[in-house]
């Protein structure tokens, strides 16, 4: 996906109330950005880091600027806007750039499914294949070049794993796709030290036939694109 116009830089002062962040631009102007990330954002919101923000053309928005990327002091780029994960995955699926998920005829988004009343991020369909259900998770937590999910205990994420296991049991295909939105990450693992139950369910899901994939994005102030697969260590 392209950022049009390109993102603008600023220096982070603080993130607060989960949804807001104050920054100062290179010209010395203080702005309040909308923060589209309700997670812990560990390592992504250190005061003094460079942030990159977009600006909406909608004049009625109370906070027209949105925090998109963080550039850490060691140079790593991180996409903190969790909505971008589904956007870049959808583009990759439509362009048939993910070999394990290519060859389908149609792509649907936000399809209702499951006993726990979930919505799957994407469903792929083809006349000669079983339906393929894809749940996307954004990975931004990095520790020693490893990416971890989740960054906080997630009952919702646990529910999604149970639903994916049910998909396999009914004879369809289920995929958990980690979209890695941190330039320093070289492999992905469940954050057992944060949410042990999620890690246990993920291992169980893989044993029962849920496919677990990770793809890393190339990040810049002008574009985000999924470019390369990464190993997943369970």
UniProtKB/Swiss-Prot annotation:
Q: Tell me which InterPro entries the record gives.
A: SfsA, SfsA_C, SfsA_N
Q: Which residues cross the membrane?
A: none
Which Gene Ontology MF annotations are present?
Answer: DNA binding
Family matches, as CDD domains: SfsA-like_bacterial (cd22359)
Instruction: Report the family membership.
Output: Belongs to the SfsA family.
What HAMAP family has UniProt attached to this entry?
SfsA (MF_00095)
Q: What is this protein called?
A: Sugar fermentation stimulation protein homolog
């Amino acid at each position: 996906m392209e950022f049009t116009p390109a993102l603008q830089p600023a220096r982070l002062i603080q993130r607060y109330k989960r949804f807001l962040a104050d920054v100062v631009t290179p010209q010395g102007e203080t702005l309040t950005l909308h923060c589209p990330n309700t997670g812990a954002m560990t390592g992504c919101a250190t005061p003094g880091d460079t942030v990159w923000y977009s600006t909406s053309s909608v004049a009625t928005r109370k906070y027209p600027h949105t925090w998109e990327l963080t550039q850490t002091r060691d140079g790593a780029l991180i996409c903190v806007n969790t909505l971008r994960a589904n956007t870049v995955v959808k583009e990759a699926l439509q362009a048939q750039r993910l070999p394990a998920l290519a060859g389908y005829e149609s792509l649907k988004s936000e399809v209702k499914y499951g006993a726990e009343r979930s919505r799957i991020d994407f469903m792929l369909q083809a006349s000669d294949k079983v339906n393929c259900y894809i749940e996307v998770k954004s990975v931004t937590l990095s520790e020693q070049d490893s990416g971890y999910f989740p960054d906080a205990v997630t009952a919702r994420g646990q529910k999604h794993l149970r639903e994916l296991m049910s998909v396999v049991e009914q004879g369809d295909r289920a995929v958990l796709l980690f979209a890695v939105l941190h330039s320093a990450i070289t492999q992905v693992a469940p954050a057992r030290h944060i949410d042990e139950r999620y890690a246990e369910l993920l291992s169980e899901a893989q044993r029962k036939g849920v496919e677990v994939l990770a793809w890393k994005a190339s990040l810049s102030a002008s574009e985000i694109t999924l470019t390369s697969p990464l190993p997943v260590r369970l």
